Amino acid sequence: MNSGPGKKPDWLKIKLASGSSFASTRKLLNRHSLHTVCRSAMCPNLHECWSKGTATFLLLGNVCTRSCRFCAVGTECRPAMPDPEEPSKIAEAVKTMKLRHAVLTSVNRDDLADGGATHWVETIRAIREVNPGVSLECLIPDFSGNEQSLDLVMQELPEVLNHNIETVPSRYAAVRPQALYERSLAVIERAKRQFRLATKSGMMVGMGETEEELEASLHDLRGHGCDMVTIGQYLQPTAAHLPVSRYVTPEEFERYREIALDAGFRHVQSGPFVRSSYHAEAFEPVEKIS
């Protein structure tokens, strides 16, 4: 086992952007007391996305019931109950930001009977009521594999249904101890087979996986009906989180992109700063994916 990845390379140095769009996005989110995965998960693309007037809305609060070792979101066994005004607040924020394509995600809420699925449905419907014509990408949790909860959300027919497997199966115990690799694949498969949705998933690299394992997981995703994939570098949020095993080079990310395309994915984003909702509008299907 090596002692670590060493000094962060130049290609991982973040260029901070600001300006009027950044300030107005931050002001809008603060005014409505809205959470974003950009801020809660310490995303490296926050400045870029907010400067372009985009954000990924985080539903069900900013406290998760799980403790994945890669994630910066806070954890508790019993977070506060969901804000009943959150769906309407997000709908108004989408309208104010003039978004054509809105991205929603949420924390895991294993403390709620339906995992928060009803709140998801209320948010989707509120957005569509106020913003006719907007397309939605829903980056959902696994709802503990509860098919009724999954179906509640999938029946709303979001334009893109996203669920991240995050890493290869050999790293699940260390990275996602409260999740199951096969369960996450089953979420993707259900969205495709039962509801014919455009499907998407994401993985992080630099967490101890091998290239062979990554390629095998990409084929697993395709075999379960996944259309689109993102691959990005894992960056340790704090000293208490899982250490980075290595920094993947831009050339390797390009090779991963080619591997994914060869596996049959319709859209692929692969790069050091790529995250599941990064440039999500580029994944918006212009034709029905099946």
From Swiss-Prot:
Q: What is its main location?
A: cytoplasm
User: Is this entry keyworded Aminoacyl-tRNA synthetase?
Assistant: no
Q: Does the keyword 4Fe-4S apply?
A: yes
Positions annotated to bind [4Fe-4S] cluster 1? C38, C43, C49, S277
InterPro entries the UniProt entry points to: Aldolase_TIM, Elp3/MiaA/NifB-like_rSAM, Lipoyl_synth, rSAM
The protein's annotated pathway: Protein modification; protein lipoylation via endogenous pathway; protein N(6)-(lipoyl)lysine from octanoyl-[acyl-carrier-protein]: step 2/2
Question: Where is it localised?
Answer: Cytoplasm
The identity of this protein, by name, is Lipoyl synthase
